[in-house]
């Protein structure tokens, strides 16, 4: 389709390969993910994450394996040498993908499940979502305190029992890559959205 041709480029930043799509194309892809029958991963990528990935091979692998990468800061575009006059800069500055994605979830009546590293983070993220996107349906949430397999299993069961469509993860770094890499085949949700180290959202939420 025409939208797919608007992909800006395959980028390489600090040795990490990323595909960069304009928001219209990224939204088309996300809508497709909601209708297929497997768990697809979408990640918001920041400079901090890329710097971490340049030092940690598993984290680099996680970012490169994401089904859809969404650039979360204009600094990433700058590092990739993308012209500041391109529309991508405004899309990134205004977090346009995030906004359109969540409004889309309200329209499709999709259920989300929120993950956080601490109870405070979890509540902050849930509060941010309900206040920013009135009508969004949060089926549940959980704090991921441990990487033990038994804890993962009970969490996967909880996510699946809520008939979750989208998992919104505020988890830091290696916690979430381990969780997704090891459990994706067991999770019945459609999309894993990793907010990562997305400072703008965290600041707005805080």
What are these regions (language model features)?
Residues 4-90:
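N-terminal nucleotide/polyanion-binding subdomain common to many enzyme families
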Residues 47-50, 171-176, 198:
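Short glycine-rich anion-binding loops that position phosphate/pyrophosphate groups of nucleotides
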Residues 76-158, 162:
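Conserved beta-alpha
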Residues 76-78, 175, 198-203:
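Short gly/pro/ser/thr-enriched loop/turn and capping motifs at secondary-structure boundaries
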Residues 126, 177-186:
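Short Gly/Thr/Asp-enriched flexible loops that form oxyanion-binding sites at enzyme active sites
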Residues 163-173, 189:
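Proline-aspartate-enriched helix->loop->beta-strand connector
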């Amino acid at each position: 389709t025409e939208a797919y041709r608007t992909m800006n480029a395959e980028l390489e930043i600090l040795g990490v390969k990323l595909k960069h799509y304009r928001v219209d194309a990224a939204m088309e892809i996300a809508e497709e993910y909601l209708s297929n029958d497997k768990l697809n991963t979408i990640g918001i990528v920041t400079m901090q994450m890329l710097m971490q990935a340049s030092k940690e091979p598993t984290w680099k692998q996680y970012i490169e394996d994401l089904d859809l990468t969404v650039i979360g800061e204009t600094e990433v575009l700058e590092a990739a040498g993308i012209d500041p006059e391109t529309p991508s800069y405004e899309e990134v500055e205004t977090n346009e993908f995030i906004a359109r994605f969540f409004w889309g979830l309200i329209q499709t009546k999709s259920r989300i499940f929120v993950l956080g590293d601490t109870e405070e983070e979890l509540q902050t993220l849930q509060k941010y979502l309900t206040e920013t996107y009135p009508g969004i349906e949060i089926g549940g949430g959980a704090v991921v305190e441990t990487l033990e397999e038994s804890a993962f299993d009970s969490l996967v069961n909880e996510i699946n029992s809520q008939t979750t469509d989208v998992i919104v993860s505020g988890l830091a770094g290696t916690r979430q890559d381990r969780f997704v890499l090891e459990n994706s085949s067991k999770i019945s949700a459609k999309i894993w959205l990793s907010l990562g180290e997305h400072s703008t959202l965290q600041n707005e939420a805080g």
